[in-house]
UniProtKB/Swiss-Prot annotation:
Site (Transition state stabilizer): 310
GO biological process, one term: amino acid catabolic process
Protein name, per record: D-galactonate dehydratase
Binding annotation for Mg(2+): 183, 209, 235
CDD domains: D-galactonate_dehydratase
Enzyme class: lyase
Cofactor(s) needed: Mg(2+)
Organism name: Salmonella paratyphi A (strain AKU_12601)
Keyword Magnesium tagged: yes
Length: 382
């Protein structure tokens, strides 16, 4: 079997799919994208395609190593996202050829279901509470929300009080009936992260995500030393070599590699194993589309340390398309009591509606994140 063609489709809301075709008619799908840099990742995919055309798609490990190591410069969000989507599609092909889901090819199940959590948008406490109520109605009891808006390197007590007030009202409204994590999104400096974490501790969030940027990872163990709340990070780390450093330094309780950013299934399975060796939980990052989610689920079901799975159903970024709009077998992604079951169809287990993909790709928007500024006019972290 040989790879004959690689096609990319930029899609709403902020996704990109790729299709790998073979000379035997077997097709694999992947999702390579950096939100806001889809065209750049697309260019990287097609640079790799020049090498991949004519190669045997079954040699996933060798193709991965060539894509990663054959160029002098390597790593980073663009290249690793391109590799990730290609890698997902290669696993999809292998599973279809062998008539088995990817998790079966990786040794079989370690669990029967995995807890899903849902994003909740909204800047005001009432909006967040209303969003949680609606999501509870469709079976969710675990959530993630923004921990704060933009915050200065040293900010005032009003900014701290606003962040804490939202969390306090959520806990007062729902008690222990729900769990929620708080995503700081790297918006907070190390000094302010110390203040916020201390103030938030009485409300027992499930985790605090990216309290500081990955570039400031030396603060993870220092922040963890002052709190009982697990610290989570990883969505802006792109290879096992970056994760190696933070695992060795300590401090993280939950690792969050992104299956569409960190080298795909091949690399993230290794990252999951590294995390287990350090007794660190796994919760793959996934605010993206259905192929990315499917890839995450296959890792969840073969990794003992996986604890819950992010997914983008109803996320505030989803303008123009929802999580399953490009999927024919929507029923396979249905949840029972807030849990996903293993996908059982061969490969990734996603039956893509290719006609809809082609149609919507003709008018796909170029999504970019907003530009925030502080009151003094300086650029703020989004």
């Amino acid at each position: 079997m040989k790879i004959t063609h690689i096609t990319t489709y930029r899609l709403p809301p902020r996704w990109m799919f790729l299709k790998i075709e073979t000379d035997e008619g077997v097709v694999g799908w992947g999702e390579p994208v950096i939100e806001g840099r889809a065209r750049t990742v697309e260019a990287a995919v097609h640079e790799f395609a020049d090498y991949l055309i004519g190669k045997d798609p079954a040699r996933i490990n060798d193709l991965w190593q060539v894509m990663y190591r054959a160029g002098f410069y390597r790593g980073g969000p663009i290249m690793m996202s391109a590799i990730a989507g290609i890698d997902q599609a290669l696993w999809d092909i292998k599973g279809k050829v062998l008539n088995a889901p990817v998790w079966q090819l990786m040794g079989g199940l370690v669990r029967d279901k995995i807890k899903a959590y849902s994003w909740v948008g909204g800047d005001r406490p009432a909006d967040v509470i209303d969003g949680i109520e609606k999501l509870r109605g469709i079976g969710f009891d675990t959530f993630k929300l923004n921990g704060c808006e933009e915050m200065g390197v040293i900010d005032n007590s009003r900014a701290v009080d606003a962040a804490v007030n939202t969390v306090a009202q959520i806990r007062e409204a729902f008690g222990s009936e729900i769990e929620f994590g708080l995503d700081f999104h790297g918006r907070v400096s190390a000094p302010m992260a110390k203040v916020l974490i201390k103030e938030l501790e009485p409300y027992r969030p499930l985790f605090i995500e990216e309290p500081v940027l990955a570039e400031q990872a030396e603060y993870y163990p220092r922040l963890a030393a002052q709190t009982h709340i697990p610290i989570a990070a990883g969505e802006r780390m792109f290879s096992r070599f970056e994760f190696k450093r933070v695992l060795d330094a300590g401090g993280l309780g939950i690792l969050q590699p992104d299956l569409s950013h960190a080298g795909g299934i091949t690399e993230c399975y290794k990252i999951a194993g590294m995390a287990e060796a350090y007794d660190v939980a796994l919760a793959p990052h996934c605010p993206l589309g259905p192929i990315a989610l499917a890839a995450c689920l296959h890792i969840d079901f073969v990794s003992r340390n996986a604890v819950f799975q992010e997914q983008s159903m109803g996320i505030h970024y989803n303008k123009g398309a929802e999580l399953l709009d490009f999927v024919k077998n929507k029923e396979d992604f249905s949840m029972d009591g807030g849990f996903f079951k293993p996908l059982t169809k061969p490969g990734l287990g996603v039956d893509i509606d290719e006609a809809r993909v082609i149609e919507l790709s003709k008018s796909a928007p170029d999504w970019s994140n907003p530009l925030w500024r502080h009151a003094d006019g300086s650029v703020a972290e989004w």
